[in-house]
Design a protein with these regions (language model features):
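Acidic, serine/threonine-rich low-complexity disordered tracts
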Residues: 1-39, 80-186
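Active-site/ligand-binding surface loops and adjacent short beta/alpha elements
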Residues: 37-96
């Protein structure tokens, strides 16, 4: 079970605070980040714990703008995909645990996809680089499909794991800001 929470500015999606609570069987982890933008040398003050590494407090530099995972997904959902070149790698930086990673996403284009429980949906498909670790091999990208409308709701994902593939779908939705216009039929 994973719980990620992110606080960031509306303008520019600049991270302010991030918390992570992970409980996956015998593995547990917590992260609490405070982004210290006003310091002479900006940094992330990170309080990090994992059952495999213990407790530690670290300061990570804010040389670029390392996003946390929820802010990174929010940023990706709000991009102007009409100005993104399909097949081109777009770099992104994010922080997790006590490290900063350089990753990328690649737009694959638009496609219509049947989603169990929803119906047929017009989507935007893109890939995100995965990091090697306890679950992912890091050799393949996670594929993500978001609605091709103003909501940009993630409706499906597939991610290769050590043994097999993890996948997930949107099961239900409510309170959308915009009409679900990419849903072509139920």
């Amino acid at each position: 079970r994973e719980d990620f929470q992110s606080w960031f500015t509306a303008e520019g999606i600049r991270p302010v605070k991030f918390t992570r609570n992970t409980n996956e069987g015998r593995y547990t982890a917590t992260n609490t980040y405070h982004y210290m933008w006003n310091a002479a040398e900006p940094y992330i003050a990170a309080d990090v714990y994992s059952s495999s590494s213990g407790q530690r407090n670290v300061n990570m530099p804010l040389n670029a703008c390392p996003y946390d995972l929820p802010a990174l997904f929010f940023l990706a959902r709000n991009m102007d995909f009409d100005s993104v070149v399909p097949g081109k790698r777009y770099p992104m930086t994010f922080a997790i645990d006590d490290d900063i990673y350089n990753v990328y996403f690649i737009l694959h284009g638009r496609e219509t996809r049947k989603i169990k429980g929803l119906g047929t949906v017009r989507t935007i498909k893109f890939a995100a680089k995965l990091l090697a670790g306890e679950v992912f091999t890091g050799e393949e990208d996670m594929m993500i499909w978001v609605t091709d409308d103003d909501n940009r709701i993630p409706v499906w994902f597939e991610a290769p794991i050590m043994v097999g593939t993890a996948s997930g779908r949107l099961a239900e939705y409510s309170g959308l800001k915009y009409p679900f216009s990419s849903l072509t039929n139920k």
